[in-house]
Amino acid sequence: MVVHALIYIFFNYDKPGLIKGWAVPIATDTAFVLGIVSFFSRHISLELRTFIIGFSLIDDAFAPIILS
């Protein structure tokens, strides 16, 4: 979660109107993770896929708290 927010702040630091949107990228990482895992699904073991998707879902469980 922190990495997404820091990347957003890095690119929008000099834009005062956009700096308040730092929480939005936090909620989008699961979509990217699912896309990447499905693309490489033949090369990733089932255990690793389960761990990556589970970690991403736990990470996104905190997104509504931050967004509200």
Curated annotation (Swiss-Prot):
Example of a GO biological process term: regulation of pH
GO molecular function: sodium:proton antiporter activity
Domain of life: Bacteria
Location of the protein in the cell: Cell inner membrane
InterPro entries linked to this entry: Na/H_antiporter_dom_sf, NhaA
Stretches that traverse the bilayer: 21-41, 48-68
Pfam families xref list: Na_H_antiport_1
Coiled coil residues, start to end: none
Membrane topology recorded in Swiss-Prot or TrEMBL: Multi-pass membrane protein
Record GO cellular component, one term: plasma membrane
Keywords (A to Z) from UniProt: Cell inner membrane, Cell membrane, Membrane, Transmembrane, Transmembrane helix
PANTHER family (UniProt xref): NA(+)_H(+) ANTIPORTER NHAA, SODIUM ION/PROTON ANTIPORTER NHAA-RELATED
UniProt record similarity statement: Belongs to the NhaA Na(+)/H(+) (TC 2.A.33) antiporter family.
Protein's name according to its UniProt entry: Putative Na(+)/H(+) antiporter NhaA homolog
Species annotation: Rickettsia akari (strain Hartford)
Name of the encoding gene: nhaA
